[in-house]
Structure formats: structure tokens, C-alpha cells
């Protein structure tokens, strides 16, 4: 029996009503795996390929044949907005079969949640943080809620398979299974899993089931891709004749930027009017600055505002307004956004995406590109690379267009190799260990040290953590009143621990700044960190406001709307760039080939950079003398191997080589003063790298590198160990030094 015939009649009717001519490859593959095996399933297919329906069509079919006696399926999504969107899509489908769909997160009313608690059934949509809260506060309900749980669907699994948030998701699944007594199958969905086999193993480890990864033939997809370069302080009117060479059918300007506009911003302004577009940026700070600039251009041109804003610090009302406008087929507006619209929220028929500078990963590039190209249109991305004009006497590193090279490298890695970054899980997730220890103890009330260790260390995420490390943690938590010992010898949450566990921010394991809610009269605008004093200006929600009052006790900022332009600040999160990206950037400088998506300014800038690289030898010789005792090292390493190299130079080699004034620009180059010469530099590095040394030796004396949210509650020894063994890529650093040694022989 083919997959379509196996579907329940109401799903077949849904397919007919939507005029689908055939099932997509991912839907056939998913149906076969769900219907004909009892394994987990990892579905890897392009954005907008129908993965959500592929997972739920067979699940709903099985439910109609044998209805679960509790919640039958959990859908875990990384964003509330994604859950809200999927809630609308699934509700229409499930209404036909009388299968309820529930969603549970911070913006959902308590009455909706109470209905689920009284009548556990159907499908529950939830974020990892809300699932944590549910297990913590509704501990006694879990067996009744999920006793007959059959499936857990993890959407955008790549975004939940890295760092502490990924580890938390896996821990939650295991804890849920233990508490409920259920053995659900896991279905992971993603467009950009870099290493499917590794992701499959993680799903298997936390569920005790084998994971199958169907081979899905990807159909040929055409992209519309362009990349242009601008100097930030260049002339306002970039040369119009430079347009149209790469993408002539796309490049007709529909507006005119004001005189003396920032060239890159003007380019975006002129090519978005009358269209539905997204403009992606890499930080919330930049999101505010770009939106404010583009809105100011509308004002100067006496045009109505046509720009929206969407990022994680905005209030739900602002975000949902932007989403609703983007879905409205009659409104042609452009939304400036961060990663919050990178994931699969349905925001309608988008014509074009812009990316200001390069994203940090191939995965992010593909997700952002994939927001367009739906409903019959090809995916379309315009890169806008911006750079400060190098001064005439600038040193070599400042003359290299790093973001342009990075953008080209990301595109080439995927088009040439179909390469995407593998997921990176922390080897020693001690911050998460604290979090799960406190969550486990808070939910069960009291446990003996042995029982607590058994519950927590048996979670697959902590398989590398030793009993000795855990004893060290528990002793420290006792000494800091995070936990207490009862008269009977058991452990309970202590007074200091209660302050953490009872705070709503405890449910999340990702790092948060101390945020202040910003209000103007009765309107909530969003949140900022480190508010300026009254009388100063802030940028939020794409407008400029003057601060009238700051209430530090209640974390509130009151302000009024004004005109002007100020930088916005929300706290920046530097990206994790893979070594393979840096190596491909080097290759871009070496190879003598063009790329069809480069526009004329970008072609000229790349040509100039290649000449600079050739004349200086920076792609052939990693160490370049900048004059006198100033040197620059170009290691072409990713973020964590670069960090290891930087510390290795300071702590292992600086004394012998006479290195001082070391100044890194991560992860591109390291400038420093050095008394030694080039040969001695490489000899010393090779000798030191050949020695066996403890990674802890690359932690500075007295340093306690707090990287993760709960590191502050750990003993210093574990923080240092987690950083040295889990963050620093010492193997990658040593491998690069070995390559230099081999090439010099």
C-alpha cells in the first residue's frame, strides 16, 4: 500500500482540497518510516519542503486508528512565534478528526492550560523552556498528561542540537519519559543538519530507540543570489551603472534614496519599495540602527513608513504586528530582523531577502535564504557587504574585506560541497548540570545524594561527567546554600537555590542580560539592557525615544517618542565560525576565479583584496611582518581553535619569543610585537605544541571564564575545566601548527 492510501480519509480529503498533485519526496519518506518502523525518524529536507505535514500526516492517521489516552504527541519548537504559527496550521487539519491541538508557553492564557490539564489529549506544542516549567510545577500531572505519549516532534532540530539548549532538550525528553512511563518515538525536522548521523545518535541516546534517516532526493532548486559591496563612508549615490550585471531582471530600483544616504542602506531602500522583503542583520543592536535609518529615509523623502522590525527584545505585540503585516498579501512592507525570523514561521509570499554583512554559518545562510522562494518563487538573497574605507596608511589586516570573503566562503561551501556545520554539543556541560540538578531536586522535593546523582548523571547529556566532578559540585552547592541537607541526610533546594528556581528565568539555559522593560505611556515597546540615565536617547522598535525615568527596582524604563538617531544596545552574541569557513576564505583569496553572484563593486573589491594578498603573501605565509617589531598572524582557524591559538601564544610562547601587545581580531588575525624572527617563531610553536600539556594550562592564572548562564553557581575548578576541555579547540590549533611545520620542512 502506498503512503497516500495509508493516510486517514480526512488527510486524503485535505490533500485533495488543497489541490496537491502529488506527495513530496519528504512526505513519502516520512510516511514509510513512521508507518513501517518503530524507530525514531530524522527528516532532513530543504526549507518549505513540507516537513511539518510529512511528520504529522502519519501521526494523525495512527491516532485516528488508536486514539491515545493522554497527550499523544508533543511538538517542541525553538520559538514561541514558530509555535503560534504551527498552531494555526495544525488546528485546521486536526479539527476535521476532532483531535485537539494545545500550545503552552508564556503568552498562553492559564485557562487554556487548565483545559489541557483537565483533559489531556491530542497534540501539545511547546518550547523547551515551557516544558521545563511544566515538569517543574506540574510534576504530579506528568504521568496523567503523558502516560500514553507516542511521538515527540522536534522542529528546527539543528537549532536545538547545539550548546546547553540542545542538551536541555535531550534531558527534558529523558526526564519526561521516566516520569510518565512512556516510550515515545522522536521525529526530528531540519533543513540544515550538518551531520545527520551524529544528530541521529543523539536522538537514539536519549530515547533508547534506533534512529532512521531516510534518503530524500532533493529536486534541483535555482537561486537568485547577488552580493554587493559598499564603503560605509562612501558617496551617497553609488554608481548606478554597477547594477544589473549579475541579476538584470531583479535590479530595477523602485525608489530613490535621499542625498548623502549611507550607500549600503540606500541600496536596500531603493530595492524594497513595493515589495515584500526581509532584511537580516547579525545583532539586535544593528537591527534597531538599520530600521531607524531606513525609516528616516522615508521621512526625508516624504513617503509613508514601509519598514517593520522584529527581534527577540521586542514586546510580543510588536513582533506579532510585524508577522501579521508580512502575511497580509495586500501590504508590501520590509521587515528588518535577526534570527527570530530565520526559522520556519510562515510569513507569506516573500519576494526577496537581504543580508547585511555575512552571517556566521552556512546553516544560518540557508535558513535565511529559505525564507523566500515559497509559493512558486525561487529563493532570492541579496548580500549587502559594508566596510569602513581603509585609511591610506592602514596596516595590512585592515585592508582585507573580511565580511565579503566570509560571505563568498559560506555560499561556495554549500554550492560546491553541500557542506553545513556539524552540531556542536558541549563535552562537559557543567552549567547545564547545575540547572538539571536544581530542576530535578525542585520537582521531586528531596533526594539522597546517591539517588540525585543516579537521576542526573544517567541522563545521556552528562555521560562524560565523572562521579568525582559531581561530588565536587554538590559540596559546593551545599556550601553556597543552593541546596541543603535534611536531618535525615537527604538533599533539598536551599534558600539561595529557591531564589533561582522560583524565578521564571530559571526555565531557560541560554544566557540572558539583565533586561529592563521599556514603556511609553501604556504601550510596552520591548526590553533593553543597561538603560541610559533620564534625558538620554535610546533606539527600540525602530524609533528613537528619550528616557524620562528609570525604575531600577522594578526594571522599568519610561520614555517618550522623539526624532533623531542613536545607536541601540541589547548585548551582542558573537558567532561561532567553523574552521572550514576560514579555510575557504583563504582559498577565495588564492583562487583566480569569479563568482556569478558578485556585483561590480564586489568584483572590484575582491580583485583588490586578491592583489593585496598576493603582494603581501598572507595566504602563503601565515606570519607577516608589518614593519619593525610588529607582526600579524593569519591562522585561518574557527572561533574556538583561534581562541586556543591566542592563549597558546600568550601562555606558552610569549616569554621565549618576546611577544607583547597581543591584539586579536577574532577569528581573523592576531597582531603583536615580537623580538624574535619568523623561523624562531615557528620553531618555538612547533616545540611547544609537540609537548603533552593539560588544557587547563591555557586558562589564565586566577581566571574563571564564565561562558554559560549558570557558571557563576559552579565551583571555580569546574568552570575552568569546562572552558579548557569543552570550549577551547586545542586539537584544531595543534593541527594547524603541525601543518605549518610540515610546510616549512
Regions found by a protein language model. Give the residues of each.
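C-terminal accessory/connector segments of nucleic-acid motor ATPases
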Residues: 418-544, 549-550, 626-640, 654-664
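Short, glycine-/Ser/Thr-/acidic-enriched flexible segments
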Residues: 284-285, 341-342, 359-360, 388-389, ...
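Gly/lys/ser-thr-rich phosphate-binding loops in alpha/beta enzymes
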Residues: 342-343, 358, 367, 372-373, ...
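Helicase motor core with emphasis on the C-terminal RecA-like subdomain
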Residues: 2-16, 22-25, 29-49, 54-132, ...
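C-terminal helical accessory/scaffold domains
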Residues: 602, 607-613, 619-650, 672
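Short, charged/polar, Gly/Pro-enriched secondary-structure boundary elements
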Residues: 232-235, 497-504, 565-568, 676-682
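Long C-terminal interaction/binding lobes of large macromolecular proteins
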Residues: 362-364, 375-403, 426-427, 457, ...
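Terminal, basic amphipathic appendages of nucleotide-handling enzymes
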Residues: 13, 380, 501, 513, ...
